[in-house]
C-alpha cells in the first residue's frame, strides 16, 4: 500500500508553474492579435504614402493627401453611397425573411429541424462559388432563370449585365446565401425565450399580434441586433459575390469599398489609395459596431426585465 501511494504521489516529469500557466494559455490569443495588428498598422502606414507598385522607387510620404483627395472625388462618394445602399437593402430583406422563417420553424419537431438543416445549405456554399453558380443560371443564352423569366414575358432580361438590374441580381444572390445565417440565430433566440409570459398571455386570451409586438419582439431584440450587426459588418465589406458576378460593373454600378480597393491595388497599382480606402472602411465598421453594441447592452437589460 505504501509503495503504491508513493508511486501515485510521484511528480510528473513535466509541470508548468501556476504563475506561468496563464501566459501560456493566452499565447494563442496573443498570436492572433499580432496577426491582426501587423497588417492593420502596415495599412495605416501605406495610407499616408504615395506608393505605386509600378514605381516602388518613388515611394514617399504624402501624409493626408490620399484621404483629402477622397473629399473632392465623385467616385469615392459613389462608392460610399453604393456600399451603404447595398448593405442596407441586403440586411433589411435578410432580416425580414430570416425572422419570418424562424417564426414558422419555431415549434420543435422533426420536420422543422430537418427543414432548418436543409435551409442552411446555401450558407455552407462559398460566396464566390454561389455567385458563379447564379451567374450561370442567369446567363441569357442557357441560364435556367433566364428561361423562366422568358416564360413570364421578360425576354432578354439582362440580370447582372444591366445597370438597372445589376444591384437587384447581386442582392438576390446575397439573400440566398446569408438569410439562413439570420434565420438560425433568430430561431435559436425564439426557442430560448422563457415560456411564462406566453403562457400567461394565452390564459388571458391576448391576441397573437399583441403577443408578437409587445412580448416576443422586445425579448428577441438583442438577438435581432446581434444578427443585424454581424450581417451589416459583413455586407458593407462584401467582395466575393459582387466581383465574381459583375467585377464592380456595369460601369461603376457596384463599385463597393472592397471592389474599389481591389481595383486601385491590382489595376491602378495605387497601394496608398487602396490602403486609405480600407482604413476608411474600418472606421465606418468601428463606428457602426459601437452603436449596435451600446444598443444591444441596453436592450438586453430591458429584455431581462420582461422575462
Residue ranges of each PLM-predicted region?
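Short, Lys/Arg-rich, polar N-terminal cytosolic tail immediately upstream
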Residues: 1-17
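A structural signal for multi-pass alpha-helical bundles of membrane permease subunits
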Residues: 18-307
Amino acid at each position: 500500500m505504501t509503495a503504491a501511494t508513493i508511486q501515485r504521489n510521484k511528480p510528473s516529469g513535466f509541470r508548468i508553474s501556476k504563475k506561468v500557466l496563464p501566459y501560456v494559455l493566452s499565447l494563442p490569443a496573443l498570436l492572433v492579435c499580432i496577426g491582426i495588428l501587423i497588417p492593420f498598422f502596415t495599412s495605416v502606414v501605406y495610407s499616408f504614402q504615395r506608393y505605386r507598385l509600378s514605381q516602388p522607387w518613388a515611394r514617399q510620404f504624402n501624409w493626408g493627401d490620399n484621404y483629402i483627395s477622397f473629399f473632392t472625388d465623385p467616385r469615392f462618394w459613389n462608392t460610399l453611397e453604393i456600399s451603404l445602399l447595398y448593405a442596407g437593402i441586403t440586411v433589411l430583406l435578410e432580416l425580414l425573411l430570416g425572422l419570418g422563417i424562424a417564426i414558422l420553424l419555431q415549434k420543435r419537431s422533426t420536420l422543422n429541424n430537418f427543414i432548418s438543416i436543409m435551409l442552411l445549405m446555401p450558407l455552407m456554399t462559398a460566396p464566390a462559388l454561389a455567385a458563379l453558380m447564379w451567374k450561370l443560371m442567369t446567363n441569357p443564352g442557357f441560364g435556367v432563370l433566364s428561361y423562366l423569366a422568358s416564360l413570364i414575358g421578360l425576354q432578354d432580361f439582362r440580370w447582372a449585365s444591366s445597370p438597372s438590374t445589376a444591384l437587384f441580381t447581386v442582392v438576390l444572390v446575397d439573400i440566398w446565401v446569408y438569410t439562413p445565417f439570420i434565420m438560425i440565430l433568430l430561431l435559436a433566440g425564439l426557442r430560448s425565450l422563457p415560456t411564462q409570459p406566453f403562457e400567461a398571455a394565452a390564459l388571458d386570451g391576448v391576441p397573437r399580434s399583441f403577443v408578437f409586438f409587445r412580448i416576443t419582439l422586445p425579448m428577441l431584440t438583442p438577438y435581432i441586433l446581434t444578427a443585424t450587426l454581424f450581417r451589416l459588418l459583413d455586407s458593407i465589406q462584401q467582395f466575393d459575390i459582387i466581383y465574381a458576378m459583375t467585377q464592380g460593373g456595369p460601369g461603376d454600378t457596384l463599385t463597393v469599398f472592397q471592389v474599389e480597393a481591389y481595383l486601385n491595388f491590382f489595376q491602378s497599382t495605387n497601394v496608398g489609395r487602396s490602403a486609405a480606402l480600407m482604413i476608411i472602411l474600418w472606421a465606418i465598421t468601428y463606428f457602426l459596431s459601437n452603436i449596435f453594441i451600446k444598443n444591444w447592452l441596453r436592450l438586453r437589460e430591458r429584455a431581462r426585465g420582461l422575462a
